[in-house]
């Protein structure tokens, strides 16, 4: 097959040997070895670094100018018209210059520190886990993500008794929260320093329409929704892989992430984060950690996909409940602690934020419930009192 494709492109085009790992070819740039026409008879070899998927982009391989590039969106400072807002200082402008993500601390059980271009955090107090599967906890930081970027939280917890789920942060004012999944039916105490992780901000990328297959248009934050097509029934303690009728064509330097939505915290479901490979159908692994059968109704948004110009990788971990972790690259955009920032002044307190979020969840559950509660059998037995 490769010989036939090579003959159709150019008899002087030779493909390098494929890597051993079947995932490595998506994360490392393949090398195209071409002979220069103006070279002597002995032939001088030119190594051209081209990230080309031969299955979809074979007709563009001979074009040396073919490259899907990404340009950073115009910074908010350039869009901010100072003439229309005279008398305002730099602290009241939408974003500081150079482009950095402003953030401020809030009272919580976590310590947040700036580490290079990431925010590192760990718990300073004991976190009590009740019999409820997922317990949302504020990370004690608020940040403003500029338009055209997204944030994501990563955790380095290797305990087999609980798992912390990553979260995608949309652009705008965000207050990240920690979702701790209790994998036992008993109370647990998480000691200080056990939960640690990072927050990074990366640029979004929207592929061309011809590069996407069966994907709905993205929302205003450049996130793509993945919905179920039929009713899914997951038994207690069972794991099921859900595939979506969607795919995308490989573009040079592009990576796609799939992360489950937070609304599933009420149904004891764990959606494993996935790196979506090009040329493959989108899919996620759903784990039912409850003792009851859960039914997911059709046309339910199960996960969100986002494209970026930074490449993420897997790290297999045997002691991790999910068996693997997603390792983020080093972000190019850093953070700056500016609690006096005008946009950060609108951040509500953690208590008020939890109340508002609960009310929003109740309203959104009426409009679009991720789990059909009429088909779900919940454990309604008596529960012991929750520890403070």
Curated annotation (Swiss-Prot):
Similarity comment: family membership: Belongs to the dUTPase family.
Cofactor: Mg(2+)
Superkingdom per UniProt: Viruses
Compositional bias annotation for Basic and acidic residues: 77-88
InterPro entries linked to this entry: dUTPase-like_sf (IPR036157), Herpes_Orf11 (IPR006882), HSV_DUT (IPR034745)
Gene: DUT
Protein's name in the database: Deoxyuridine 5'-triphosphate nucleotidohydrolase
Functional pathway: Pyrimidine metabolism; dUMP biosynthesis; dUMP from dCTP (dUTP route): step 2/2
Region: Disordered, residue numbers: 77-96, 336-388
EC nos: 3.6.1.23
């Amino acid at each position: 097959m490769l010989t036939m494709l090579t003959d159709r492109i150019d008899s002087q085009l030779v493909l390098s040997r494929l890597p051993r790992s079947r995932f490595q070819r998506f994360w490392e740039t393949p090398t195209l070895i071409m002979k220069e026409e103006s070279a002597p008879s002995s032939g001088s070899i030119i190594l051209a670094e081209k990230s080309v998927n031969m299955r979809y982009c074979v007709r563009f391989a001979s074009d040396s100018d073919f490259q899907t590039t990404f340009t950073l969106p115009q910074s908010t400072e350039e869009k901010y018209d100072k003439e229309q807002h005279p008398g305002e200082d730099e602290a009241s402008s939408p974003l500081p210059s150079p482009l950095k993500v402003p953030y401020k601390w809030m009272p919580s059980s976590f310590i947040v520190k700036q580490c290079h271009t990431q925010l590192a955090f760990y718990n300073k107090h004991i976190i009590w886990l009740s019999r409820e599967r997922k317990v949302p906890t504020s990370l004690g930081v608020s940040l403003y993500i500029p338009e055209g970027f997204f944030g994501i939280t990563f955790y380095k917890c290797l305990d087999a008794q609980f798992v912390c789920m990553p979260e995608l942060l949309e652009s705008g004012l965000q207050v990240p929260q920690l979702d701790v999944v209790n994998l036992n039916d008993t109370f647990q105490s998480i000691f200080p320093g056990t939960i640690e992780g990072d927050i990074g901000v990366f640029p979004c990328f929207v592929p061309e329409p011809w590069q996407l297959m069966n994907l709905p248009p993205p929302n205003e934050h450049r996130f793509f929704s993945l919905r179920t097509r039929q009713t899914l029934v997951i038994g207690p303690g069972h794991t099921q892989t859900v595939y979506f009728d969607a795919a995308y064509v490989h573009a040079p330097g592009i990576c796609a992430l799939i992360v489950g939505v937070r609304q599933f915290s009420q149904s004891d479901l764990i959606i494993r984060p996935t790196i979506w490979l090009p040329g493959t159908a989108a899919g996620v692994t759903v784990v039912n950690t409850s003792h009851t059968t859960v039914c997911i109704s059709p046309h339910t948004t199960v996960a969100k996909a986002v494209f970026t110009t930074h490449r993420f990788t897997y790290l297999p971990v045997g002691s991790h409940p999910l068996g693997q972790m997603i390792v983020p690259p080093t972000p190019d955009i850093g953070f700056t602690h500016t609690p006096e920032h005008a946009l950060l002044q609108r951040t509500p307190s953690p208590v008020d934020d939890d109340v508002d979020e609960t009310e929003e969840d109740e309203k959104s559950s009426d409009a679009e419930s991720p789990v059909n509660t009429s088909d779900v059998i919940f454990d309604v037995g008596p529960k012991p009192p929750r520890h403070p």
